Amino acid sequence: MDVKPRPCANPAYAGKSFGSNAAAWWGFHYKDLLTEPKPREVCTIYEIDTSGQRNWAQAVYNFRWVPQTDPFGVVHNIIDYPGVPVDHSIVQENHNVLKNVRVPIRPHFGVMGVAPKEADIVDSIPPSYFGGNMDNWRVGKGATMYYPVAVPGGLFSIGDSHAAQGDSELCGTAIEMSLTGTFQLILHKQNTLTGSLAGLTYPLLETQDEWVLHGFSFANYLAELGPSAQQDIYSKSSIDLALRDAFRKMRIFLMTTKGLTEDEAISLMSIGVDFGVTQVVDGNWGIHAIIKKSLFAGMATA
């Protein structure tokens, strides 16, 4: 897989690429601000420089969100709908922002996954066993993702392209920008799955050096939370639940694919597995567990 930023379509900025980060109302920070006005939403515009050996994002300006009227006459007091055009004559641009700070870009797609079997129409925000809006920046160039297929045809979808994001996506978004991706799709029949893919029931990321398992507050929220799951998931998620799910998945992974006892698996998790917060902004919160392949260099390849 390859991922590349797209150049700006505005001829005034030919050859340049830009992205935006919205510190929005659904962000983890929103109700815990220090300075006035509180609450507030802030958009920061970044220029993406891909001209050198190391590619960077650098802030150009930011502005506080003020009510915006869309082309249909609807007033948006908050960032409640994607793609609302911003009238720059009524916002105050601050060009003195993040001076001399350059962020290495990590282009990736926040949404990649297949369709679940539990519902015909599914909210695209919460991720689950089928993948979806996982927002893991490690799913970039050269990565391999495995998803359990739940419906005929799989119905793979992709979107939510990011130039850079940290673990947690804390303020609600990454640097959102247009990307061009190249993908290869391979169907693995369930009865042929062995090694690290045996019995896979969740999204698994494989890189050259690591396996990354994905845990969620609810491993299958559509089944676990009942008829109102797509509403209830936003109020019932927690980091504790997501960590518990990631722990359980990694325990089984080590016991079944590496032949460890439960006691061995638990010890290894504590000393050799990195658990991290994938995201806390997508309804079904995520914890990832990273284990390096080099730990098993003395074992037969699986």
Predicted regions and their residues:
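General structural feature for long, well-ordered alpha-helical segments within catalytic domains
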Residues: D135-K141, G181, I239-A242, A246-M250, ...
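Amphipathic, heptad-repeat alpha-helical segments used for oligomerization and assembly
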Residues: E224-T256
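TerminUS-proximal long segments
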Residues: I252-A302
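Short beta-strand elements
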Residues: M1, L185-L187, A289-I291
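Intrinsically disordered, low-complexity linker/loop segments enriched in Gly/Pro
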Residues: D2-G140, Y146
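Conserved mixed alpha/beta catalytic, RNA-binding, or beta-rich assembly cores of soluble enzyme
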Residues: R102-S237
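A generic structural signal for short, non-catalytic loop/turn and secondary-structure boundary residues
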Residues: N96-L98, G140, E176-S178, S270, ...
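Short, Lys/Arg- and Gly-enriched loop/turn segments at beta-strand edges
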Residues: D2-A14, G153-A163, T278-V281
